Amino acid sequence: VTNDEFRAAMSRLAAGVVLVTAQEPPLDPDDPQAPAGEDVGMTATAFMSVSLDPPLALVSLREGSRMDDLLAEQPLWAVSILAENQRHIAGRFAMKGRISDRLLFKELSWTRGESSGAPLLTDALATFELRTEQRVTAGDHTLVVGRVLTARVPGTGGPLLYYRGRYRHLG
């Protein structure tokens, strides 16, 4: 199968859209006065539950991406499931080649996770805080399996979906 054939066939599978977040470690972890690390976010559609006992979920990250590199050194991360009215957030964090995410978080309503320290969208359909249990290289991606530390359902409404190369909603 060619890459184009595979991509075209997989585009027919509707997927939920999530924001994966983590906080970079401080620049000098030995200095308690050192500024906190920067918050980082990435839009993803490959997030799924793996196990109920223990509670595990995974996200698939492009190997060598900024988030893949960060989660290789930072074991705590979070996921916010996006609602249908959060398409702008998905687009904002899907941009490639950006240097900093500081401005991307600036106008969003979020709180810092108590278990992960990562940003959690306050109006997401659901949020998860996770600790990496396993990393598996799979082709050009890394599957990051995390133990779910917290799971909350702060929002209501319908989910944001990704189907045939576009963001969509149910209905």
Q: Language-model segments: what does each one mean?
A:
Residues 1-171:
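Basic, polyanion-binding surface patches
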